[in-house]
């Protein structure tokens, strides 16, 4: 909340010659007693292309300021023509009326100013060298541009409106970088945890697969052992059968299977019994 409010500004001498002083009747309201004076300042914008040509026409301190509505007449000197580029002397420019409290600007009023020659002949055929004595100004007082700023007053805490300090932006950037680094580290840790979590089941799965492969190999070995045992048993049975046949041949003096008509016959158990 602003303690001082600008109620109105009246341009007293308008239009006027370029060399005439500026006069403003300023009305404002003060809501609370102030410890410091108000500083009013008028600035003439000499060029729209560079701030180097700006001229501070005048500044005054007003105070002590009583509570209530106050009015005063502010008079400022005209700008120096030699400090203004010749190409922009007779043209449209801007003047700025501002007020500050304790070095802090809280209100600014801007006006457009049209500078032109005072005769039709000079306006239609301007001379190469500007004739300042024939230049008049016309302030567009009906269309001011008012800008207000929040500042610290006497009854407000400094913490609410901290002053600008050099290097604060750099510190904030450093803090942001640290936060980003912490976020990246956190993201890396989370990624590592996820990788660890994904490795866990895979590792178990690989272990299970390894055990299954070992079981399969063991089964294959067992099967091979069984096949070898079966082959050994068959070989033993074959050997026993050959021994039995040889014994029968020794007893009868002729082979067991007698050939009839050139065909071999296999004796049945009955035939074997009869022969004995």
Curated annotation (Swiss-Prot):
InterPro entries: ASF1-like, ASF1-like_sf, Hist_deposition_Asf1. One of its GO terms (molecular function) is acetyltransferase activator activity. The keyword Transport does not apply. Its main location: nucleus. Residues 151-276 are annotated as: Disordered. Residues 155-197, 211-254 have a biased composition (Acidic residues). Gene3D superfamilies: Histone chaperone ASF1-like. Residues 202-243 form a coiled coil. Keywords: Chaperone, Chromatin regulator, Coiled coil, Nucleus, Transcription, Transcription regulation. GO terms for cellular component: chromatin; chromosome, telomeric region; cytosol; H3 histone acetyltransferase complex; nucleus. Residues 267-276 have a biased composition (Polar residues). GO terms for biological process: cellular response to stress; DNA replication-dependent chromatin assembly; nucleosome assembly; nucleosome disassembly; positive regulation of transcription elongation by RNA polymerase II; protein modification process; silent mating-type cassette heterochromatin formation; subtelomeric heterochromatin formation. It is found in: Nucleus. Belongs to the ASF1 family. Histone chaperone that facilitates histone deposition and histone exchange and removal during nucleosome assembly and disassembly. Interacts with histone H3 and histone H4. This is Histone chaperone ASF1.
């Amino acid at each position: 909340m602003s303690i001082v409010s600008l109620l109105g500004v009246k341009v007293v001498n308008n239009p006027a010659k370029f060399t005439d002083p500026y006069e403003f009747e300023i009305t404002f309201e003060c809501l609370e007693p102030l410890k410091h004076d108000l500083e009013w300042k008028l600035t003439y914008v000499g060029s729209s292309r560079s701030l180097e040509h700006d001229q501070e026409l005048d500044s005054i301190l007003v105070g002590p300021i009583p509570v209530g509505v106050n009015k005063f007449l502010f008079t400022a000197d005209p700008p120096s023509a030699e400090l203004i580029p010749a190409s922009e002397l007779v043209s449209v420019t801007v003047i700025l009326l501002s007020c500050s409290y304790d070095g802090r600007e809280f209100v600014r009023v801007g006006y457009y100013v049209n500078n032109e020659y005072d005769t039709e002949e000079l306006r239609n055929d301007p001379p190469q060298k500007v004739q300042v004595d024939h230049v008049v100004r016309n302030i567009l007082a009906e269309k001011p541009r008012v800008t207000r700023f929040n500042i610290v007053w006497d009854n407000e805490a400094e913490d609410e409106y901290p002053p600008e300090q050099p290097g604060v932006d750099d510190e904030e950037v450093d803090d942001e970088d640290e936060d980003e680094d912490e976020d990246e580290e956190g993201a890396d840790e989370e990624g590592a945890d996820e990788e660890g979590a994904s490795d866990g089941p895979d590792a178990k799965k690989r272990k299970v697969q390894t055990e299954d492969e070992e079981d399969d190999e063991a089964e294959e070995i067992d099967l091979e052992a069984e096949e070898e045992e079966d082959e050994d048993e068959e070989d033993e049975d074959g050997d026993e059968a050959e021994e039995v046949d040889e014994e029968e041949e020794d007893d009868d003096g002729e082979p067991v299977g007698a050939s009839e008509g050139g065909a071999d016959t296999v004796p049945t158990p009955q035939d074997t019994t009869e022969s004995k």
